[in-house]
Design a protein with these regions (language model features):
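A short, Lys/Arg-rich alpha-helix, primarily the initiator
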Residues: 1-13
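Key DNA-contacting residues within the recognition helix of helix-turn-helix
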Residues: 8, 33-34, 62
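Alpha-helical residues within the helix-turn-helix
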Residues: 12, 23, 52
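Short alpha-helical DNA-recognition segment
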Residues: 15-34
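Short, conserved catalytic or interaction motifs in soluble domains
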Residues: 37
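DNA major-groove recognition helix of helix-turn-helix/homeodomain DNA-binding modules
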Residues: 45-60
């Protein structure tokens, strides 16, 4: 699995911590970390929730 550097970069640019993003999308901080490091691939619904919070289309944030 590829790292999701674009997701992490977008999160940092918005000034949102992993913890805050997790709260906003209804998951745990460790899950956000695992997504950003490529250890897990988020489900389509979670991808969309993250994209909505970061105000980016999913294809700009995720490799898959």
């Amino acid at each position: 699995m590829a790292e999701n550097r674009r997701m992490a970069a977008a999160r940092v640019l918005k000034g949102i911590t992993q913890r805050k993003l997790a709260e906003l999308v209804g998951t745990r901080e460790i899950e956000i970390s695992r997504i950003e490091t490529g250890r897990v691939t988020p489900a389509a619904r979670l991808k969309q929730s993250i994209a909505d919070v970061l105000e980016k289309p999913t294809f700009e944030l995720f490799d898959n």
